[in-house]
A protein has these predicted regions:
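A generic structural signal for residues embedded in beta-strands
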Residues: 54-55
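Aromatic- and Lys/Arg-enriched surface recognition patch
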Residues: 64-132
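Compositionally biased, charged N-terminal/linker segments
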Residues: 1-48, 60, 117, 130-146
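Short basic/aromatic-enriched segments
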Residues: 58-64
Length: 146
């Protein structure tokens, strides 16, 4: 789907729980100030104060799902020293307590969320997106944390 600001509810940023230390970073509540994205027309739409959720994928070591929420703190910019399409977007990330995280199973159980792009195209590059309807459904699950 072509994303436009007219039907963007929030961004969905992804981390691979099997190939990264994201579980350890979440356990320590590490402050994360930037996230890697791949330059596209979508990154050109990214701007400060837009909401996002962090989706952690994985099968072996982590429970996949939404682990954090936050807002973008600026536009996506070229990652210094990187070549190609790699960019970084500044973020203000807030880790969710483990009991509040929304697992992939819980997302699939909610008919309002079953069509998330991250479920339909799990290998797609960062960023993914949520519609306003998806955001309303997620807020039902994550309130008052988000």
């Amino acid at each position: 789907m072509v994303v436009s600001l007219d039907h963007l509810g929030a961004w969905l940023l992804k981390a691979n729980g099997d190939r990264s230390d994201i579980a350890e970073r979440a356990a320590r509540r590490d402050g994360i100030t930037h996230w890697c994205v791949y330059r596209s027309y979508r990154t050109a739409l990214m701007d400060s104060r837009q909401p996002f959720v962090l989706w952690v994928s994985g099968t072996r070591h982590v429970t996949p799902g939404i682990w954090a929420v936050g807002t973008l703190a600026g536009e996506a910019v070229a990652d210094s020293g990187a070549t190609g399409r790699r960019q970084r977007v500044p973020v203000m990330l807030r880790w969710l307590d483990e009991r509040i995280r929304l697992s992939r199973a819980a997302v699939l159980a909610d008919p309002r969320l079953r069509d998330l792009e991250v479920l339909r195209q799990p290998q797609a590059a960062n960023p993914s997106f949520l519609t306003p309807g998806h955001v309303r459904a997620l807020r039902d699950h994550l309130a008052p944390a988000w």
